[in-house]
Amino acid sequence: MPSYIDGQLAGAWGQGARLYASGPWAQGLPSQGYQLALNPAQLYRTCIGAVRRELAARGLDFPEAPAEARDAFLREVEEGRVDCGGFSSAVFFETLLANTVEGFFSDPSYGGNRDMAGWRMIGFPGAYAAYLQLYTHHGMRFDREPTAMGDAAARRHPHDHPGGRAGEHRHG
């Protein structure tokens, strides 16, 4: 998941390209969505630093701590009880959870869903290019291995290239 999240934070979303960033910064309602003066990359940097400081202050080595202690600390972050420098740790937790779920179920080309594990878990077939013959067959089993966008492009089906064979390039 780190590769997926790092990619998102380095891109337009992480830099807040589509976020209104001119204030004023009043406390918003949950229905109003993201209401911080930080872009997502800044939120991650700020809150990860705050979480690390809080763990150090408690003498808690997160990876080595018992599962119960890790769960209890994550619950505190989720409930907004960890100070993130004036920002709610709940917003950070919500963002981190959403990015983790996105990465787990995204196409592997985005850096998450290694070996299509998320898709295999739920039985999602992935990015097959041609469902035309199947879309009216409701309730039909579809027992194929998942395929990613990159896999579909590499297969080069004949129906994608009229007059040619799979894998054959035609130059005019």
Per-segment meaning from a language model:
Residues 1-172:
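Mature-region segments of soluble proteins
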